[in-house]
Design a protein with these regions (language model features):
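Class I S-adenosyl-L-methionine-dependent methyltransferase catalytic core
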Residues: 1-141
């Protein structure tokens, strides 16, 4: 399977200051959306495999993948698993009103914009200085 993220700029890393703070609180044991520039095989595809008990989820933000990972997080939470999702704030969407609001245990809106880490056209690691959008942490359990 081709890497579904590499060509549409979905490979942005979570800054350590956000992950570390959340990990202190939740003690994650799995990340279904790690940065991956290689081929995503079925045994590594976060949409196909079983998740851990305490999951950190910063999904690709393209619409279809974001929706798929939110729905998978809800599905996993119904099995008694914790899923902490870092998502763009988009409160007018069907995803927010029909999936996130009715299923979220908690929603935390972050102050300021997150400066995600990615790679420029020269392959150099950079952050997006201004942040692209507001962010929220959505907890499903």
């Amino acid at each position: 399977m081709k890497n579904r993220n590499i060509n549409n700029h979905d490979n942005w890393e979570t800054p350590a200051y956000i992950y570390d703070e959340l990990n202190k609180e939740f003690n994650f044991d799995f990340d279904p959306c790690p940065i991956c520039f290689d081929e995503i095989t079925p045994d590594k595809d976060g949409l196909l495999i079983e998740w851990g008990q305490r999951n950190f989820v910063n999904p690709p933000y393209s619409r279809k993948l974001k929706e798929a990972f939110v729905k998978k997080a809800i599905e996993e939470s119904k099995k008694g698993k914790l899923c902490v999702c870092l998502l763009p704030v988009s409160t007018s969407t069907i995803l927010f009103h029909d999936y996130i609001l009715p299923n979220a245990y908690d929603i935390r809106f972050l102050r300021g914009r997150v400066k995600f880490i990615g790679y420029n056209t020269f392959g150099e690691k950079v952050d997006n200085k201004a942040g692209m959008h507001d962010s929220m942490v959505v907890i499903f359990k």
